[in-house]
């Protein structure tokens, strides 16, 4: 179900490098553009990719959490220090104002179901990996597919190695959910 590309021209790190260079050229990084606009900028590109590849069923928006500097979100899996992960779901609803009408998301329930399925599989196979599901008021581009999540992989206090180590069990969990394995 999941394919890993060793070719450095097409793998995720290569894509990350390309995105960083493009963002730097457009002055999106280094604090020059309001981060609140990041989802608007990303949405345009994601919609283009989805239009060109309509068979894409899953969107994973990968982030790291922001935590106090003395907090380290790490566990050990297969003898390796591994960053803990958390799904972040946007509800297009706030307690103070109710529905966020200008940010509709027809897939709120689908997105939540997907997150809960991931959480369930994590609890079965990697009980210390998953930090839970965080619910927030906006939509974070999760309206683009029924299986869309924002994944917090560790935090700024985790090493790159710890975050990379989290991707192996996450890929296993994702595969189990997408293929119906238990």
Model-derived features: where do they sit?
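A short, glycine/acidic-enriched catalytic loop
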Residues: 68-104
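Extracytoplasmic/secreted envelope proteins and their assembly/folding machinery
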Residues: 6-13, 40-47, 115, 119, ...
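Second-shell loop/turn segments in exported
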Residues: 1-2, 9, 28-40, 45-49, ...
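Active-site-adjacent substrate-binding region
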Residues: 107-134
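Catalytic-core regions of hydrolytic enzymes
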Residues: 14-74
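Solvent-exposed loop/turn segments at secondary-structure junctions
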Residues: 20, 28-31, 64-69, 91-95, ...
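Active-site-adjacent mobile loop/cap segments within catalytic or ligand-binding domains
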Residues: 129-182
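Structural recognition of the beta-strand scaffold that forms the well-ordered cores
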Residues: 20-22, 58-61, 86-88, 132, ...
């Amino acid at each position: 179900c999941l394919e890993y590309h060793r070719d450095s021209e097409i793998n995720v790190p290569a894509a990350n490098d390309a995105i960083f260079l493009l963002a730097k050229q457009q002055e999106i990084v280094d604090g020059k553009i309001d981060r609140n606009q990041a989802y608007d900028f990303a949405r345009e590109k994601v919609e283009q990719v989805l239009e060109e590849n309509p068979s894409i069923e899953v969107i994973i928006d990968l982030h790291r959490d922001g935590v106090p500097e003395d907090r380290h979100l790490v566990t050990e899996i297969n003898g390796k220090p591994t960053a803990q992960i958390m799904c972040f779901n946007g509800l297009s609803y706030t307690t103070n104002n109710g529905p966020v009408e200008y940010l509709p998301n027809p897939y709120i329930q689908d997105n939540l179901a997907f997150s809960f399925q991931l959480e369930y599989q994590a609890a079965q196979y990697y009980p210390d990996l998953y930090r839970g599901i965080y619910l927030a008021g906006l939509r974070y581009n999760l309206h683009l597919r029924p299986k869309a999540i924002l994944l917090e992989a560790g935090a700024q206090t985790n090493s790159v190695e710890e975050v990379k180590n989290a991707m192996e069990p996450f890929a296993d969990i994702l595969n189990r959910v997408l293929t119906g394995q238990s």
